[in-house]
Structures are given as C-alpha cells and as structure tokens.
C-alpha cells in the first residue's frame, strides 16, 4: 500500500473488529476460533482500501490542461478511451460516492475534493453530465455547497 501508518491503523481496527465478531457471533456447536485468527480478516479489510498506485498523478496538470481534462471527462462519460488511471477511477467512482470515500487514501480524498470543487466551480456543465451518471441524487454537490456556505459564514 505504501502507507505504513494506514496499514497499522487498519490492522488495529481489524483486530478489534475480529475479536468483537468472534466473541459476539460464535455459532453454537462450533469451536471458538483461536485468538490468532484475525489475520485473514485483517487482509480482507486492508484489501478494501482503493489501490494507491495512481495517488501521485498530477491533478493540477490535468485540471489546467483542457485536452487532458476533456479526455478524463470523456472516459468517465463512456464516450472516449481511458488511460489506466482514468479506467481505475471510473471503476471505483460509483463505490467511492456511495460510501462517501471511506475506502479512499488521504491523497485520494484530497484529490476527489479538489477535482469536485474545480468541476462544480469552473465547469458546471461537465459536472452536471457526470453527476447524472455517478450521483443522480446530487448528494455530493449538496454536501459541497453546504460546506462552502458554512466556510463563507465563518469569520
């Protein structure tokens, strides 16, 4: 994964969850699993985080170069070819929106917010087209607008 702190935190959470699950949900008649068995569960939980291999993509370069940005948008709309990182984004985007980016790395969360702010503020037509595909309820836009109005209210 590349983020030892993240793995360590997931490992601690996984261990607690695994211990709670084995304590609370023991099936009658089956032996209680040994205390050393949370390892497979920890691996499954770590696997749930999105791959970080594209975390170092230069978002500013993409957002500031019309041709690059349009290529990404076309990929996400399904009207153009996808680079490997855009393809991965297209695959995980529905889940990331549905789960409020809970599986995102810190860089991915920051990048998602940055790109979303840019599209909503600077390219509303593109945002509306993508929103119809990935967030028809407008949930993310509503959250962003609420956050933006709160930030404007604060001194």
Curated annotation (Swiss-Prot):
Summary of the tissues where the protein is detected: Antenna. In the third antennal segment. Expressed in sencilla coeloconica.
Alphabetical UniProt keywords: Secreted, Signal
Entry's Gene Ontology cellular component terms: extracellular region
Keyword Transmembrane: no
Top-rank taxon: Eukaryota
SUPFAM superfamilies noted in UniProt: Chemosensory protein Csp2
Signal peptide as annotated in the record: 1-29
This protein's record includes keyword Secreted: yes
Entry-linked Pfam families: OS-D
Compartment(s) of residence: Secreted
Family: Belongs to the insect A10/OS-D protein family.
Protein name: Putative odorant-binding protein A10
Gene: a10
């Amino acid at each position: 994964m590349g983020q030892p702190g993240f793995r360590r935190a997931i490992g601690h959470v996984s261990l607690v969850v695994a211990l709670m699950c084995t304590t609370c949900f023991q099936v009658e008649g089956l032996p209680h699993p040994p205390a050393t068995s949370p390892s497979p569960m920890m691996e499954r939980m770590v696997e749930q985080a999105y791959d970080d291999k594209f975390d170092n993509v230069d978002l500013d370069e993409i957002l500031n170069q019309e041709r690059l940005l349009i290529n990404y948008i076309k990929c996400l709309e399904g009207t153009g070819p996808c680079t490997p990182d855009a393809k991965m984004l297209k695959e995980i985007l529905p889940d990331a929106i549905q789960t409020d980016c809970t599986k995102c790395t810190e860089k991915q969360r920051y990048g998602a917010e940055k790109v979303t702010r840019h599209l909503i503020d600077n390219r509303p037509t593109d945002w509306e087209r993508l929103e119809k595909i990935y967030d028809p309820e407008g949930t993310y836009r509503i959250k962003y607008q609420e956050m933006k109005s709160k930030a404007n209210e604060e001194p």
